[in-house]
Amino acid sequence: MPPEVVRGREWHGRGVSLFAWTNEPDDSRQPPLLTEHDGRIIGLNGHLADPADVTRLPDDSAGGCFSAWIARDGELSASTAINRVCPVFHAETPDLHVAGSRALLVHLAARDDDRVEHDVLALQTMVRQGFFLSDETPYKGVSALRPSSRLLVRDGARTITETPLPQAAPMPTSARRKRAAIGELADALLATVEPLRDLGEPVNLALTGGRDTRVLAALLHAARVPFRVTTNGLDTHPDVIIARVIAARLGVEHTVIAPPQTAAKDAVLVEHPLSRAWETLRTCEGMTSAYETIVSYLPYSGKPTMSGQSGETLRAGSLNLLQTDLGDKALRRRIETTFGKDAKLFTAEANEHAQELARPWLARTDRLEALDHLYIWYKVGRWQASARAGSLRRGDPVRPFLDNRVVRAALSLDQSWRLSEEVIYTLILRLAPKLRDVPIEGKPWRFAANQAPALFRRRLPEHLPTARTAGGWSWRTSPGPALTDLLRDQVLGSLDALTPIVNPDEVRALFAAPVVAKPALAWHLYTVSTLLTGLYPGKQPEGLPRITVSRPDPAR
């Protein structure tokens, strides 16, 4: 972002300095950049549901999406919330302890020179998955603080304490107990949005026909928060059809943004992959693959927005949702493949490292809980924490599903119960009974399809199958020969940098065809290759041509 939009504050005490920067134009969004209370200087990364809670930090019961930094003479602490989506990175040298919200900054601040030293072995997980399945970072000596953890440096000595994620209670056996359990989750959700009542302008909710944004529409309705909804798509798309019904039932304004209607294209012009990689490395610091589309910079806006990001938390996490077989062997295999994907591509050392990272998760006897917590630790706490850096330059959207109290309440509910989707179905009806018979987009409710008797299923709303866009294709998943050539040239041209973690012959085989068969893996390799060969930090590439990517089958 332009340096002129960044402002900062700093505090210096005995043996401790605290620096804070933001692109928010002023402190109208409370709490301010730094808060002084009871002899402590408190900094906040993210937001609190109740800004007054800043004086209670660190506190596991605080609502919001945040990490906290507290300084006084001779003492510094940094703490994460339950999902660490606002991260804390830390490093230690013989003379210095450094903690910060940006990993590369921590790395450079801890060094005597300005040279970047990478942790190549740690990057094996970036190549496999496009994000980190560990507490490692791309930078030597820099680690991510775990969820619900506190780093404390007092008079030069560092300690780290960690609060385990909540253990889920057994599934309630009576309707009364189910209502009570879901009531606690509903109360936590309501607390996240109640402060939005007094903003003076409505919240803009991106509404689809699916589950997660419906929870949010019901939530805003129940909390009496003024809001309007926006849906992207054609009038015939299930998202638009269902969102229109929801908006009418709840009495809110609904705007449909139709995609541009252009003639079918047999090819598209796309950004040069080196430019894409540079922006991804700059924004996400080598912890997100350039395969992902990172939100570009726009001037900061304080307008309240909301989407269904991370709604899988209420449904036992995306890793469990991928499963059709919930047997022990199948769930164990999901953990193994999550950490050990594409094993043939990697060196023995890289595979051993992946197995070491998987070991504590495989040791858990409750597989559903393990996959549920894996989602929080890594899919939210590393992938989303990194990828959302782009959108945070534009503003700080309200994310109820990332709220510290909401996540804690959700994790306290039985995983199989959440996975059945009965929890969110009941939650929607509790918050907005008017939505009882509104169809759902995609597959039927899981508990209805798998468990409910036929008579009960007939009382549930119908589902509308996910629309298939005729002739739809993506240049990322069908990169074509020209883009494949560029990915191949970069990766094969820098194999020496990658050989500590990958087998060169397997990499060559991956790129042997004119069009790479595993484009996501190719992009992950490309991202790590450009990182290790010094693309960033460095000057932004200039004068690179756009690339023509042809549709695989123009006649289709």
Where do the model's predicted regions map?
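Cysteine-centered catalytic environments shared across enzyme families
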Residues: 1-264, 556
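Short alpha-helical segments and helix-capping/turn motifs at coil-helix boundaries
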Residues: 53-55, 63-65, 134-138, 288-298, ...
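Structural motif
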Residues: 115-123, 362-373, 419, 509-525, ...
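Short coil/turn segments at secondary-structure boundaries
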Residues: 136-143, 392, 422-425, 439-444, ...
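ATP-dependent adenylate-handling active sites, centered on carboxylate activation for C-N bond formation
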Residues: 155, 167-368, 383-437, 449, ...
